[in-house]
Amino acid sequence: MYCRYICYLLLYLIPTVALAEPFASRLDSVAVEPHPFDETLQTVEVRANSKRLQTMRIGQTIEWLDSTYLTKHFTGNFAATLSTLPGVNVITIGSGYGKPVIRGLGFNRIAYVDGGLKQEGQQWGADHGLEVDAFDQDPVQVIKGAGSLLYGSDALGGVIVRQPAATPHKQGLYGSYTMMGQSSTMGGGGSLMMGYLHGAHHIRLRMSGQYHGDRNVTADSITYLTRWIPIYNHRLKNSATQTYASQLRYEWLGEQVKASLQASVNGERSGFFPGAHGVPDLKRVLPDKSRYNIELPYSTVRQISTQGSLQWRVSPQWQLVGELGWQQNLRRELSAFHTHYGTMQRPVQDADLEFEFDLKTVSARLQANYYAPWGGKWTLATDGQYQWHKRRGYGFLLPDYQRATSGVSLTYQGRIAQGLYLTSGLRYDLGYIAMSPYHDPYLADYLQERGESSATLAQYYYSSQEGERRWHDLSGSVGLAWQINRHWLWKVNLGRSFRLPGIYELAANGIHHGTFRHEVGDPSLGSEQGWLLDSEVGFHNDLWSCTVSPFITYFTNYIYLQPSGEWSILPHSGQIYRYQSTRALFTGIELEGTWHLHPQWDYHLQGDYVYTYNVADRLALPYSPPARLSHDLTWHPTHWTLSLKHRIIAPQHRIARNEAPTPGTATLLDLAVTYDGQLRQSNYRISLAIQNILNSRYYDHMSYYRRVNLPEAGRNLLLTINLSF
């Protein structure tokens, strides 16, 4: 089956051998600059030429997303915007948040870094996304492949780096306002940004919010725990979402010292469809009076972070960088109190609180950069992190725990011959975790009443065992970038990375209605270890440009969630999903191209294919992304931009054991119109996008709702207005 789709990719590629986004659209994560502060203080426009040069000097595949790209693909969901890149998918969670997947790797294998602070919002599994402001993501780097050298073990699969906004050229007050609305949720949002630059002082404030109603869907029913559940009026009851975000940043821009302080708050309140949460009950899905109310069951998320950084130019060759951060990630899931055991009593306080996960993190980083006279750059860095987690609620999924990690790294980047650049490094990490025990007396009574054996009672006496684990490992990489001539570029990167297992992989044990399953961790799991080899071949001239990026990753110990086929002993839970490890292979290819048909016409094509293989089972790994292909034609006369896009999403029949396939090929059409104008001293932009014009019904194999047979959203009109001054 997939041979056909590989052929489709090749057939699209053959007539466009020279198509792809120009090299200027990519940027390395650590640029080689002769002056340590040029990289930080220059604006995106000033650095347009240097971005192309820097890209040619890095062996990794890196995407640079500027304001033009982010505005064109804005959806109100940052992870969904990233999924427009080849090789990047998204697990959509509600209307505002999602979880990015890069080359088939997701969850805690992808690090999101905001101004040097790694966000910890993905700690708890599939229904927990990136709590970030979708309006405040300019500029962004996406590093495909292992980024563990710079960002630690959680960057095994890739890194998303949000850089601080560029400092304006002019002194004084500046700002922008953005508002958006969409038809699929009959909701919208807005964001206000104000900044002030006076001498060396720069302060910037942004406040954002979104308000969405129940989602329109193309289905009239779902299947949950083998039960048929109706969806009335094609509207998913209680799926409304509210998000808010604010950030305050202060910078001191001195001659030799640059310092910054930043504080931010991100939050969400999102309802769960009652027909797929808890014990099935058809009465709970009857229509209510409002599509905007959020009733039980629902979840709330709040992420608070503060961070400070200091850059000191000691000499023309030396620069010291220090960063310190604190964050709290608080998630609460509320559901009308229900018990799976007859002896359990209603709690006196917070009776409807099913789960509360409260994770606090302190992190620090020290870095020394040496800019050699011949143009190379050495970086010696050390970082550490300490976390402590507390749980509450009448349900159990994860225990209390404490976790500490630290690492030291040495990297080099520089030219070794004419047109040939080397990037290499080594990193050593240590990790420690202490897990607290948890005993559920109501479960013990329930099992005794059922007459279970003493062995079963002993097995289930503790939902979580007390234990400590320690890890240490080495990671490294070497990459070459060869600028063959002014038209051709070749890159290759070989690396070894590892990842410490997450708490849910070690100690999860409970019914998680948010993910529709009973998850069980394994405290004996070792760290993930993998070897990565990727390459990139590119061609560009004034008329054509093309990039082809094959990759392969082999894991000697890959941790994944496997449907076991075992029926859980807990009531109303379905089969058990167990975390286990295996040898695994991820390989695939990405292609991207652009043909400048005319000064006002462009044709763009991109596609990706990911192949996963479980060596032990000789099957695919769970949640493998389907092949995708898209192409669009864009007309951009003065002030206007009109784009028509055709997207193809392949079915997914390569599945893990006990995983459902996703049949059918999705063929989607999108249309976007943008007008850029000027009003007095202010610039404005009006964009109207029509997504899924034909209102096609299709399933996404990566979707959070795929397990209950809920199709993706139908036709959606998205209006965005931006005013900057």
Across the structure, where does each feature detected by a protein language model lie?
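Outer membrane beta-barrel strand-and-loop segments of large Gram-negative receptors
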Residues: 351-367, 407, 520-526, 532, ...
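Structural signature of Gram-negative outer-membrane beta-barrels, strongest in the C-terminal barrel
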Residues: 375-385, 396-555, 596, 604-608, ...
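Short, acidic, small-residue-rich periplasmic hinge/interaction motif at the N-terminus
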Residues: 22-71, 107
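Short acidic/polar hinge/loop motifs at secondary-structure boundaries
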Residues: 118-144
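Extracytoplasmic beta-strand/coil segments of soluble accessory domains associated
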Residues: 62, 79-118
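C-terminal beta-signal and adjacent terminal beta-strands/loops
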Residues: 212, 218, 498, 554-557, ...
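Gram-negative outer-membrane beta-barrel transporters
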Residues: 417-418, 551-555, 559, 564-568, ...
